[in-house]
Design a protein with these regions (language model features):
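An acidic-aromatic
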Residues: 51-98
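Short, well-ordered strand-loop elements centered on a beta-strand within folded domains, enriched
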Residues: 47-54, 71-78, 132-139, 157-163
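N-terminal beta-strand/beta-hairpin edge segment
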Residues: 27-31, 36-60, 67
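N-terminal leader/targeting segments and the immediate start of mature chains
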Residues: 1-38
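Edge/loop elements at the starts and ends of beta-strands within beta-rich repeat scaffolds
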Residues: 16-20, 43-48, 67, 155-157
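Short, surface-exposed charged micro-motifs
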Residues: 39-42, 62-64, 126, 148-150
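Amphipathic hydrophobic-ligand
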Residues: 34-36, 57, 61-63, 142-146, ...
């Protein structure tokens, strides 16, 4: 039986919440048949501030974004990637990835599973929990999933593997934690 609950007051997404830690991942981005690989680094700089950097393995910056409260800043982006549509897609995907406490609209639970409906950048997102562990964030439109963030190899509030998959366009981002 599915029950409706009171919204939680604690962190929904703990994966990038430690300001003392640099989160470094090997990244592969597959977009419209083009593959880009490199290093993906996320750093929490303050209470509601994150910086996200994607570089080639040679150290060239592909993009460098900052999220602070409700603001988004493009610190640097490769000229070939400087397209408004791409920047907006990355902004939505990455905001959902690092936002720790989104505004909760509804909470549903069934046995060890919980589903939390939120609103991020005016888009409906669902946070899926299995035994209190965040496993997926899904953005929907008209009741259909259009973007899925899947977290795997989770240990001590750290996701060792993250896949961001778009259902409506050919875009997949795979992040694998480096030791």
């Amino acid at each position: 039986m599915v029950t409706k609950e009171t919204p939680p007051q604690n962190l929904l997404n703990p994966y990038f919440s430690d300001p003392d830690k640099d989160y470094v991942y090997k990244a592969n981005i597959d977009a419209l048949g083009n593959k880009i690989g490199g290093l993906f680094i996320i750093k929490k700089l303050g209470e509601k501030t994150h910086r996200i950097l994607f570089t080639t393995e040679m150290g060239n910056t592909l993009f460098d974004f900052s999220f602070q409260e409700d603001s988004f800043t493009v610190n640097r982006i490769l000229k070939e990637l400087d397209k408004k549509i791409l920047i907006n897609i990355l902004k939505r995907d990455l905001k959902a990835l690092v936002l720790e406490k989104p505004a909760v609209e509804q909470v549903f639970s069934k046995t060890n599973n919980r589903l939390i409906e939120t609103n991020i950048l005016s888009k409906k997102h669902y946070f899926y929990f299995d035994s209190e562990e965040l496993t997926d964030i899904v953005r929907t439109r008209n009741g259909k999933a259009i973007v899925k963030h899947h977290f795997a190899n989770i240990e001590n509030d750290f996701a060792g593997q993250i896949n961001i998959t778009h259902e409506n366009i050919q875009l997949k981002i795979t992040l694998t934690a480096l030791p």
